[in-house]
Design a protein with these regions (language model features):
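Transmembrane alpha-helices of multi-pass small-molecule transport proteins
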Residues: 2-15, 62-116, 175, 213, ...
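Glycine-/small-residue-enriched transmembrane alpha-helix faces in small-molecule transporters
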Residues: 2-74, 193-225, 278, 282, ...
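Juxtamembrane helix-entry segments on the extracytoplasmic side of multipass membrane proteins
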Residues: 29-34, 65-67, 100-104, 187-210, ...
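Specific transmembrane alpha-helical segments of multi-pass solute transporters/efflux pumps
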Residues: 43-46, 92-140, 182, 282-302
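Helix-helix packing/entry segments at the starts of transmembrane helices
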Residues: 75, 120, 135-148, 218-244, ...
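Membrane-interface helix-cap regions at the ends of transmembrane helices
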Residues: 80-101, 178-195, 242-276, 282, ...
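C-terminal-most transmembrane helix of multi-pass membrane proteins
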Residues: 311-386
Length: 386
């Protein structure tokens, strides 16, 4: 009898140790994913600003024109696809695309379109409907409102996937949302936006919803679907399908939308004859592709709420790169962020830190700070495959 009791105690102890190690592995995986997301925010911040590096020459046309912006996005998608083709190895990449024979895989294409080409169209419309006091369009406020996809993703995770967020996360999300809305209202007043611009702001919120839907849908497909796609498969299928759509219809539709012929949209590709223009856009595509790969690694490891929240760090990195470009005297004029921008952004960055540290904070509150730090860095045995 005594031997049986001792055996049961040893088995229970082994089970408890295994559960503790599994918990530590899960926490580490989430934290590592969040780090990937934070790094991806750096790349996503610099890519849009790279157009300022291109010398202002007549042959390029207006670099700020929608058709040029659409061309930039199209090349980004193509270069990102090429990067993944090389990085994941051609054979693996082709095998990823073969998954399209499964109906479930087409959901990746759908969510990719919603968070890619469709979102871009809605954002362009929101900019066109946002009118400043001079009668021109203004994309500042719509761009700020896109960041509300974080709260949409958190609410969506809670409603549809019964995800549980800690009090730290909800508090930081609520504060961030208020700050983003406050900053948007401040900019709207400062720029003297017309009341008719409310329509554009509503479209920006719809666009934010599309980004949240992409994060939620892709996360579900990678964790709970029948196939359980890897992040490599998901990001490759999403990017290549978006590249094909943008290549076929991106610039032509943008041309038609702005009163040019459908075929005029393809003429923009002639700009590749100007090497400085081409090299910068190709480099932007590689940076964007690398950032997207990190973003999807974060999505599969940490979930949609943490992933979208890491992108709030773009509020910090974008002005930092603006200051760098100003100091480097890039060919095009870069506007310096206003003083009140930082009044809103510093608390948002702090909230991003709180959300990103949530897993560690919750765990530390249960086991103590010393043990939590020890578990974060101590070497643990590899997980048994038995």
């Amino acid at each position: 009898m005594a031997d049986q009791v001792n055996t049961d105690q040893l088995l229970q102890k082994e089970k408890n140790v295994k559960n503790e190690l599994d918990t530590i592995r899960t926490k580490r995986r989430i934290i590592l994913g969040i780090m990937y997301g934070l790094i991806s925010a750096v790349g996503y911040s610099i890519v849009p600003l790279m157009l300022y590096i291109i010398p202002e020459k007549v042959p390029y046309g207006n670099l700020a024109a929608p058709i040029n912006a659409t061309f930039y996005v199209t090349v980004q998608e193509i270069m990102a696809t090429f990067l993944m083709f090389i990085f994941y190895k051609p054979k693996n990449f082709i095998n990823f695309l073969k998954l399209l024979r499964h109906k479930e895989t087409w959901l990746i294409v759908l969510y990719g379109y919603l968070g890619g080409p469709v979102a871009m169209v809605f954002f362009q419309l929101s900019v066109l409907l946002t009118i400043n006091h001079q009668g021109g369009t203004d994309g500042t406020v719509p761009g700020l409102l896109l960041n509300l996809n974080v709260i949409f993703a958190a609410v969506g995770s809670t409603i549809f996937f019964r995800a549980r967020q800690s009090k730290y996360t909800w508090t930081a999300l609520a504060i961030s949302t208020c700050l983003i809305l406050g900053m948007s209202i401040h900019f709207a007043i400062e720029e003297g936006l017309a009341w008719s611009s409310i329509g554009g702001m509503c479209l920006a919120l719809v666009t934010a919803g599309f980004y949240a839907m992409e994060a939620l849908g892709m996360s579900h497909l990678m964790s709970s679907s029948k196939i359980k796609f890897t992040n490599h498969e998901t990001v490759s299928i999403k990017t290549s399908s978006s590249a094909i759509l943008m290549l076929l219809l991106g610039t032509p539709v943008a041309a038609v939308f702005f009163h040019q012929s459908f075929w005029d949209g393809y003429k923009i590709f002639a700009n590749f004859q100007y090497y400085d223009y081409a090299l910068i856009i190709l480099a932007g595509g590689i940076i964007m592709g690398s950032s997207r790969m990190l973003y999807y690694a974060c999505l599969v490891m940490s979930g949609p709420t943490y992933t979208t929240s890491t992108q709030l760090l773009m509020f910090f990195w974008t002005p930092i790169f603006q200051y760098i470009f100003i100091a480097a005297h890039v060919p095009n004029k870069v506007s310096e962020p206003t003083w009140y921008y930082w009044v809103y952004v510093i608390p948002i960055v702090f909230c991003t830190f709180i959300i990103s540290s949530n897993e560690f904070l919750v765990h530390a509150s249960k086991v103590g700070w010393k043990r939590a730090f020890h578990e974060l860095f101590v070497k643990i045995p590899k997980q048994s495959t038995k």
